[in-house]
UniProtKB/Swiss-Prot annotation:
The keyword Cytoplasm applies. This is Glutamine--fructose-6-phosphate aminotransferase [isomerizing]. Its EC number is 2.6.1.16. Residues 286-426, 458-599 form the SIS domain. HAMAP family: GlmS. Induction: Post-transcriptionally regulated by the GlmY/GlmZ sRNA regulatory cascade. The sRNA GlmZ, together with Hfq, directly activates glmS mRNA translation through base-pairing. A second sRNA, GlmY, positively regulates glmS indirectly, by sequestering the adapter protein RapZ and protecting GlmZ from RNA cleavage. GO terms for molecular function: carbohydrate derivative binding; glutamine-fructose-6-phosphate transaminase (isomerizing) activity. One of its GO terms (biological process) is fructose 6-phosphate metabolic process. InterPro entries: GATase_2_dom (IPR017932), GFAT (IPR005855), GFAT_N (IPR047084), GlmS/AgaS_SIS (IPR035466), GlmS/FrlB_SIS (IPR035490), Ntn_hydrolases_N (IPR029055), SIS_dom (IPR001347), SIS_dom_sf (IPR046348). Homodimer. In pull-down experiments interacts with CedA. It comes from Escherichia coli (strain K12). PROSITE patterns: GATASE_TYPE_2, SIS. Keywords: Aminotransferase, Cytoplasm, Glutamine amidotransferase, Repeat, Transferase.
């Protein structure tokens, strides 16, 4: 969601801040701003509604000089998107940027008004600026003021604070929203995502929950909320910002759809050996833990939740392990009964999804056997806090609507299923079929991508529609969910997905000539049942678009469009059938002229509740 970048150096830092913000644009935002302080304490602040490029243009018109600065991209939570609500916020000489939500901002606002403070924005962040200012007036250093102010905040925050009168220091505090310090030579940096700092450093310290950091050019000191100094290990990162430019593609999403064959190859690299899945990266004790697993609980949000839903079918049918999948925001606020020897699996592209992280932390209190994170970002909070972790190795995903992160999550999950089936002593043919299918998957997707022009032609039929219905059965039902999510995310068409067997239990009432119905139809044991559901739609005049196996025996008619798909191995069919639905959503959005890579109101990494 929001992005933070801070720098303290002997050189001008404005361009470092702007480049950091550019690297965080993919997370989603509606406004941007920065503040820079020079050695004499002169502070310059610029804020703009819209893209970082508009802020950069303003910085060219009003050159910013100074070695200390903080910058921010805002995704509105409290207060509409506007320049006055954009960060940084100030209270006299105190300057603040903040990610998260301060839940008790209203009573704090009233207290501060009673003390004479005037609020100029609608944001909860301005409360932090005035509160630190008030505490500083009570005496002591900026660090002491921050240590007194922070315990008064309830909610999630990652915040960076500077005092323009003392430009030699930055203060940062983290609770529920990530912050990482970048270590340089005679200069230091801070950001909400290490990607922002890769041009200036490879050495990082990840702040932990409750940490408060004091950063100067030559030192970093970290304290807990009591003011006691704590030690945090610095690491050398090999993370690559490999998004590059869009090349021949119009959008990052299109590029990332086409990158999926190579992304899946990268996910598989080093993990298949002698016809078996090799997950030795999990460490020497992983087999002992995994062999005890009698139940799997999966937590995720959004697209990751849909991948978890697919894997439930795999864990149960192929590994014989009962599996439950739950939306993380629901799990964390209900009283749940923990099954015996239950493994907690969390799924997140970013590894910073607030609800998923909170669910992981809750699982440790509830007594789960262990935790395993499946993630695309090494060093993320989810990875650091889990017992075991598997990286998807999808490469940087810029488009807000997930594509290659989803299919590589499924690839990792299927490898884990193979591993567990072997540990459970099941028939070796299960793992053999999974490995064979996964090795064939990249070429199968390349075949499918050759159908792009056919799908593009169909997209015209959707451009004037307001609703769409997706249907699937078995492990294709979650793929229908994912297809509906993609269409609504980027084309703004209201789309719903149902298990096809539920058609008569409500959704059939929606069917008419203006309701496109998209069906995924691999040639499996559920095909005949699915054909009956399709006939129910045809009989009521619905417009059908069926992505069907070439051997499934479908014939196009006036109200049924058949898009033939190459035959694929059954075990990989859910991954394969995801791709045409991604392309359909992309082309519909293109016709409608929406912002494909950064759809309205959405963020790539949801770091608040």
């Amino acid at each position: 969601m929001c992005g933070i970048v801070g720098a303290i150096a002997q050189r001008d830092v404005a361009e470092i801040l702007l480049e950091g913000l550019r690297r965080l644009e993919y997370r989603g935002y509606d406004s941007a701003g920065l503040a820079v302080v020079d050695a004499e304490g002169h502070m310059t602040r610029l804020r703009r509604l819209g893209k970082v490029q508009m802020l950069a243009q303003a910085a060219e018109e009003h050159p910013l000089h100074g070695g200390t600065g903080i910058a921010h991209t805002r995704w509105a939570t409290h207060g509409e998107p506007s320049e006055v609500n954009a960060h940084p916020h100030v209270s006299e000489h105190i300057v603040v940027v903040h990610n998260g939500i301060i839940e008790n901002h209203e009573p704090l606002r009233e207290e501060l008004k009673a003390r004479g403070y005037t609020f100029v924005s609608e944001t909860d962040t301005e409360v932090i600026a005035h509160l630190v200012n008030w505490e500083l007036k009570q005496g002591g250093t900026l660090r002491e003021a921050v240590l007194r102010a922070i315990p008064q905040l309830r909610g999630a925050y990652g915040t960076v604070i500077m005092d323009s009168r003392h430009p030699d220091t930055l203060l940062a505090a983290r609770s529920g929203s990530p912050l990482v310090i970048g270590l340089g030579m005679g200069e230091n940096f801070i950001a909400s995502d290490q990607l922002a700092l890769l041009p200036v450093t490879r050495r990082f310290i990840f702040l932990e929950e409750g940490d408060i950091a004091e950063i100067t050019r030559r030192s970093v000191n970290i304290f807990d909320k009591t003011g006691a100094e704590v030690k945090r290990q610095d690491i050398e990162s090999n993370l690559q910002y490999d998004a590059g430019d869009k090349g021949i593609y119009r959008h990052y999403m299109q590029k990332e759809i086409y990158e999926q064959p190579n992304a899946i190859k990268n996910t598989l690299t080093g993990r298949i050996s002698h016809g078996q899945v090799d997950l030795s990266e999990l460490g020497p004790n992983a087999d002992e833990l995994l062999s005890k697993v009698e139940h799997i609980q999966i937590l995720a949000c959004g697209t990751s939740y849909n991948s978890g839903m697919v894997s439930r079918y795999w864990f149960e049918s192929l590994a014989g392990i009962p599996c439950d999948v739950e939306i993380a925001s629901e799990f964390r606020y209900r009283k749940s009964a923990v099954r015996r020897n239950s493994l907690m699996i969390t799924l997140s592209q970013s590894g910073e999804t607030a609800d998923t992280l909170a669910g992981l932390r809750l699982s440790k209190e509830l007594g789960y056997l262990g935790s395993l994170a499946i993630c695309n970002v090494p060093g993320s909070s989810l990875v650091r806090e889990s017992d075991l972790a598997l990286m998807t190795n999808a490469g940087t995903e810029i488009g807000v609507a997930s594509t290659k992160a989803f299919t590589t999550q499924l690839t990792v999950l299927l490898m884990l299923v193979a591993k567990l089936s072997r540990l459970k002593g099941l028939d070796a043919s299960i793992e053999h079929d999974i490995v064979h299918g996964l090795q064939a998957l990249p070429s199968r997707i390349e075949q499918m991508l050759s159908q792009d022009k056919r799908i593009e032609a169909l997209a015209e039929d959707f451009s004037d529609k307001h609703h769409a219905l997706f249907l699937g059965r078995g492990d294709q039902y979650p793929i229908a969910l994912e297809g509906a999510l993609k269409l609504k995310e980027i084309s703004y068409i209201h789309a719903e997905a149902y298990a096809a067997g539920e058609l008569k239990h409500g959704p059939l009432a929606l069917i008419d000539a203006d309701m496109p119905v998209i069906v995924v139809a691999p040639n499996n044991e559920l095909l005949e049942k699915l054909k009956s559901n399709i006939e129910e739609v045809r009989a009521r005049g619905g417009q059908l678009y069926v992505f069907a196996d070439q051997d499934a025996g479908f014939v196009s008619s006036d109200n049924m469009h058949i898009i033939e798909m190459p035959h694929v191995e059954e075990v990989i069919a859910p991954i394969f059938y995801t791709v045409p639905l991604q392309l359909l959503a992309y082309h519909v959005a293109l016709i409608k002229g929406t912002d494909v890579d950064q759809p309205r109101n959405l963020a790539k990494s949801v770091t608040v509740e």
